[in-house]
Structure formats: structure tokens, C-alpha cells
Amino acid sequence: MTFLENVDKAKLRKILLIVISALALIALALLLVIIVVSIAPGSLKKSDIKYVDYTVSEKDISMGTLILADDAHPFTAGQALNSTMINCQQYRNQNRGDVEKGPYYAMNNVQLTQTAAAAAHKLLVAAENAVKEDNLLIKYAFYGDDGKTVEFQTGMLMFLTDYEETKLPEGYAAWFKEHAHEYGFVESYTDAYRYVDEAHAKYMTDNKLSLADYIAYLKKETSRDTVLSLQDANGNKYAVYYVACKAGDKISVPETEEYTISGTNEGGVIVTVKITK
């Protein structure tokens, strides 16, 4: 064997070692990508939550931020909400001060649930600060609705317009489409925004899902064992799953984590778990 042949074999071994190392690094990178994608917000993953039994109440079934209300799903809990509604104009005045100055206005008889009213106030103040146009009105909500849209009865839907009650100004319309989810709202139909909570609003907006479509997706794809991993606009993380049930049934809920239950008005509930670890 010549000296040249020895040199060539040494080079070949070195090249093979480099190739093998490169392939190993590529394989490791692909594995990391798979791991990251599998746990990324907005993806399905196997649940590692420790559960306990919980008996579902009638309130759990019939109320909540994800309750479906349309012609096919009549909302029957409206009367029960009466005493808990917040007048939007009064809330605006109490939290802004001088009624002669902005931000938005609301028709005297429109109301929202306490949670939706607080979120709507933050949303509308942020909108006026960004658009800098004093011309924003809540025309319809729980009371003073249009008499046609069942969803107003939930106390979580508001219809927005200008002071002339004609249409939402273009600047506001564009801003709401981009930022409403940051405050827990999604566009139900043109210029009408429904509160669904921050945990769900970003995912629904990013994936262009109506509330009905979102519920159908959760019903098909999730369970206590397979949850949807979500992250809201503020970086808070959640695990979400659907359970088909009726009042009196036992379902699984987290033993230690903070969670909420929302009825869907179509045969089940959605459990939203706040992930802190």
C-alpha cells in the first residue's frame, strides 16, 4: 500500500465522519422541531393534567362565555342574567369621569354582562386612543337589541356604529379586526363583536373560526386526554377540552389548576384550564 493510498483513506474517513455528524445534527434538529410543534400554542397534545370528578350543574350547562345562541340554539337563560347586567353607558361614565368627554358612548338601554362590559370598556377606550376619532357608539347589546339576533340575549354581543347610527367608521372597523381578540372579542358578523374570553379569541381569530365552528372543532378533536394548547395575546397559556354532558353528570376537571366551565347550548361544556407551570 502506497503512502498516497493511506492519505486518501484518511481523507475518506474524515469526510465520512463529517457527513455522519452532519446527518446526526439534522436528525436532532428535526426532532426538536417536532417536539416544539407538538406543544406549540394552538395545537393538540396529550394531557398531563391530574383530574378529579365534578358534578355538572344546570348553570354550567346553560351559561358561559362560549355559549352558542342562534336560531338553531335558542338561549333560555336570558331572564336569569337580568339582575347581573351592567348598563354600558353608566359603566363608561363611572370609569371615565366626565360624561361630556370621550371615549365612546352607548345607547341608554344597552347592557352587557359584568365581564363583557369591563372587557368592552378596555377595548373601546384602546380603539379611540389608537384611531383618535370621537365617533364610536354601542348601538345594540342585551337590551335595545335589533329584535332579530338571538345572540344579543347572552349579554356578550355588542353592535358598534358611529354617532349617526349608520356604520362603524373605517378606521375603527380595521382596528377592531386586528386587535379585538386582545380583549377577548371576536367578530360575530359585520360590526358586531362577541365576548368569548382572551383564552379563545386569539385562536378563533387566527383560524377564522366562528363560535359554532370552534365548538364543533373542540367537540371532534378534544377530550380530557387530548387537549387544545392555547396562548392568548398576553402570553397566558391554557389547555382546553370539550365534554359531552348534561346537568347532573360527572365530568373530569383539574385537581389543582385554575379552570372555568362554559356551557355550549348544544349538549356539552368546554373546560378551560389556565397553565401556570
What positions do the PLM features span?
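Extracytoplasmic cell-surface/polysaccharide-interacting catalytic and binding patches
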Residues: 2-277
